[in-house]
Each structure stands twice: as C-alpha cells, then as structure tokens.
Amino acid sequence: MMVAKYVKRMMGGAIASIVVLGGAMAAAPAHADVGDGLKVARSNACMGCHAVDRKLVGPSFQQIAERYKSDQQAVPKLAKKVKDGGSGVWGAIPMPAHPRMSDADVRSVVQWVLAGAPSK
C-alpha cells in the first residue's frame, strides 16, 4: 500500500515536470542561424528598404558588410540598430525600429549581412 502511494506521488511529480518543461520549451523562441538570414530578412520586410547588392531606401547589405568588416563590435552594434532603429549613419532617412523581431532572428540577419548576404 505504501509503495503504491509512493509510486503514485512520483508519477504525479513526473507528469507535472513534463507539463512544466513542455510549456517552457514551447514558449522558448526558435533559434535561427545565419543560414536563415535571407529568409528572416524577407519575412521581416527588410527587403522593402534594402537589397543585397544595390542601394534602395537604405544601403545594400553588401555596403553594410563592407563598412563593418573590420569592426569587432559589428554584431551587437547592428543588432541594436535593427531593434532600436537609428538615423544619420547612411543619410537622412531613418532606419525604423523592429522591436518585435526575436533576438535570434536579429542575430541571424546581422550575421548573414556581415557574411556578405549570400543567396544560399
């Protein structure tokens, strides 16, 4: 009888743990990698102002990569620019903020841009 009670309590704890961990895993943001940079850029309207190899409203991704190629702090600088927006670096037109982009998606796009915005 006592063993059955112990097993029942252990099973209840195990099930509760699975539910809690499962919920935490479902709530965790998906982690994009640099290979997803182009896909993430397209799905977050980046291509409305930027192109890979030519200036549109904003600089081309290749121009950005060239400007920041020797900057050791390029990833955090550009990630902040994507999240918070900014102006004056590439002209008078401001970069709009993208606060709803996940940190993983921002990092993916920034790393992809700094890699020269490859098409694959």
Placement of each model-derived feature along the sequence:
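N-terminal secretory signal peptides that target proteins for export/translocation
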Residues: M1-R9
